[in-house]
């Protein structure tokens, strides 16, 4: 049986990666959402939850005992050392869950898999995928989208962008680059063109 490559979908914050992920899901791909996994491991009952509290203090908790991601973000974004400490706690747990989900999907016969992961390069998880797709927009567009979406000031948005590998560097390491600075239809057409080169229509008839 022909097995499709696992796509590693990445990009910069507010580059529109979720749009590409949604289009691929509509086309029949199973999506492993690393951001969702990262949120899940910071809920009560997970080992990373207590480690983060022990490291950054109880002031990051909400009244009902959840980790307030906004408070945690203010501590780590703009402070590389603290961000590295947080990543050293969360990345191993995220990796463990991703491997588990890939195994579950492939064992059940699903071979159209997309790993949607913003920090694919930063977390050194490229070995999990066969092909790397980077969603690209110019930095000024990133800033505009991030400020509008999250209500950040320009400095707050820049701090979050600077906490990731520059998007231009990710583009250099990509197998596929999707320009998401235009319309959704333009983005969709790019994706369909790429998949047609894979003879995707033949696979879709399996």
From Swiss-Prot:
Reaction(s) this enzyme catalyzes, per UniProt: 3'-dephospho-CoA + ATP = ADP + CoA + H(+)
Name by which UniProt lists this protein: Dephospho-CoA kinase
Residues annotated as binding ATP: 14-19
Superkingdom assignment: Bacteria
Enzyme Commission number(s): 2.7.1.24
Record GO cellular component, one term: cytoplasm
Membrane-spanning residues: none
Sequence ranges assigned to domain DPCK in this UniProt record: 6-206
Family the UniProt entry places it in: Belongs to the CoaE family.
